[in-house]
Amino acid sequence: MIWHVQNENFILDSTRIFMKAFHLLLFNGSFIFPECILIFGLILLLMIDLTSDQKDRPWFYFISSTSLVISITALLFRWREEPIISFSGNFQTNNFNEIFQFLILLCSTLCIPLSVEYIECTEMAITEFLLFVLTATLGGMFLCGANDLITIFVALECFSLCSYLLSGYTKRDLRSNEATMKYLLMGGASSSILVLGFSWLYGLSGGEIELQEIVNGLINTQMYNSPGISIALIFITVGLGFKLSLAPFHQWTPDVYEGSPTPVVAFLSVTSKVAALALATRILDIPFYFSSNEWHLLLEILAILSMILGNLLAITQTSMKRMLAYSSIGQIGYVIIGIIVGDSNDGYASMITYMLFYISMNLGTFACIVLFGLRTGTDNIRDYAGLYTKDPFLALSLALCLLSLGGLPPLAGFFGKLYLFWCGWQAGLYFLVSIGLLTSVLSIYYYLKIIKLLMTGRNQEITPYVRNYRRSPLRSNNSIELSMTVCVIASTILGISMNPILAIAQDTLF
């Protein structure tokens, strides 16, 4: 009898919880419509995988890409709407959050065609790969709009767990397993440190979890200038430093880049940074509003270390992926200038603009590396020598993307860095901008060193990998070449059309 009553109570409680969740989704679902499209795409992928055979593999790519494109379209239709806080204050929708969501969706959309041929050649499980990519994208989108500490943590872990699984997707590769273990341990440690900082904020604000309410709570408890806030700031900055691969919290990055499948590295190298930047701008600008001088100083130190160490260590690398790992550490150091400047001198606008350019430059470079790796089986920089003699299109594409990453005019990277440094100079960050300029010149050296190798025609320098290289036609139906072409064109011409991009970025400021 007692068991029967307890069972009835459990059913009633479960029904109430379900009805409450359904009520929330019914009245707030329109505010997360782009995310709902991705959820529907995930469910559709699972259903087709359970009821189909290997012949239907093209459908998996089509469903994934279509759901991402429709989600982007839904975001664009919602542009310029009034800011809305939904789900009882847990989620915020505004232009600033949506531009980061757009960047994440754009990265994922470009990464899927980049992965098709790689998955077919390595015989990886296609459905699980696409599920992890879409789920990571979903987690990143929720992270961009999360308005309380719990939602931030859940969305961050949703993204992180999928990232760990993707990095170890080639289970038979020992390097991939090693990369996954390092990524998991370092990622788990960084999440723990971040949560420790959140707990300090929660306690000091009197038990508040919403970002704006934390500020009000700190004012009410008179704790906004207490030593506890400094402790919370240090913990959260360290946690964000790990997620952004800022020096000296960058040790995991080169090993994960080298050991993970190249399309996965391409995906993580941009989406993880966009999602973490969306979190950093909001978590530092809102709860730590009264400690702006302190977190500005911390970020300046991390940015200087990242720019110097990232570019110096990149010079010594022999692996293309490790070189790009250290290069990305230097690149994120430049982007931090935009966060420090803030919205007073178009700092956020310059950061968003540069991240858009960085997506095209970085993904274009990785597309070239994926193609070369599939055709030769090597990742060594020396093995790229003489590629221009065998595949001019691939060599020129890689050269343009590297030059854009280095910031040479008239490519997009030059205009992105120019505006970023100009905003920093206007804000009085003279030393930081000077370091950025010097390290940018340094980065051009190792990019040009690779380009010189690509264009060499001396037989004694050409390795057997290039001598036996399979020549590809100028026009190809290869999906990787499609992604590469789009990214190369964007890396070349986006800087010329910078004014409308800047206008859109300036509209996103909250």
Swiss-Prot record:
Could you confirm whether the keyword Transmembrane appears in this record?
yes
* Transmembrane stretches, start-end: 31-51, 59-79, 99-119, 124-144, 149-169, 184-204, 229-249, 261-281, 295-315, 323-343, 354-374, 395-415, 418-438, 484-504
Q: Write out the GO MF terms.
A: NADH dehydrogenase (ubiquinone) activity; quinone binding
Return the EC number.
Answer: 7.1.1.-
Q: Which reaction does it catalyse?
A: a plastoquinone + NADH + (n+1) H(+)(in) = a plastoquinol + NAD(+) + n H(+)(out); a plastoquinone + NADPH + (n+1) H(+)(in) = a plastoquinol + NADP(+) + n H(+)(out)
Q: What class of enzyme is it?
A: translocase
Alphabetically list the UniProt keywords.
Chloroplast, Membrane, NAD, NADP, Plastid, Plastoquinone, Quinone, Thylakoid, Translocase, Transmembrane, Transmembrane helix, Transport
Any one of the GO BP annotations: photosynthesis, light reaction
Please give an example of a GO cellular component term from this record: chloroplast thylakoid membrane
Localization of this protein:
Plastid, Chloroplast thylakoid membrane
Keyword Plastid set for record: yes
Topological category with respect to the lipid bilayer: Multi-pass membrane protein
Query: Which Pfam families has this protein been placed in?
Result: Ndh2_N, Proton_antipo_M
Record's family?
Answer: Belongs to the complex I subunit 2 family.
Task: Output the HAMAP family linked to this UniProt entry.
Answer: NDH1_NuoN_1
Q: Oligomeric state and partners? A: NDH is composed of at least 16 different subunits, 5 of which are encoded in the nucleus.
Q: What does this protein do?
A: NDH shuttles electrons from NAD(P)H:plastoquinone, via FMN and iron-sulfur (Fe-S) centers, to quinones in the photosynthetic chain and possibly in a chloroplast respiratory chain. The immediate electron acceptor for the enzyme in this species is believed to be plastoquinone. Couples the redox reaction to proton translocation, and thus conserves the redox energy in a proton gradient.
| Identification of the protein by name | NAD(P)H-quinone oxidoreductase subunit 2 A, chloroplastic
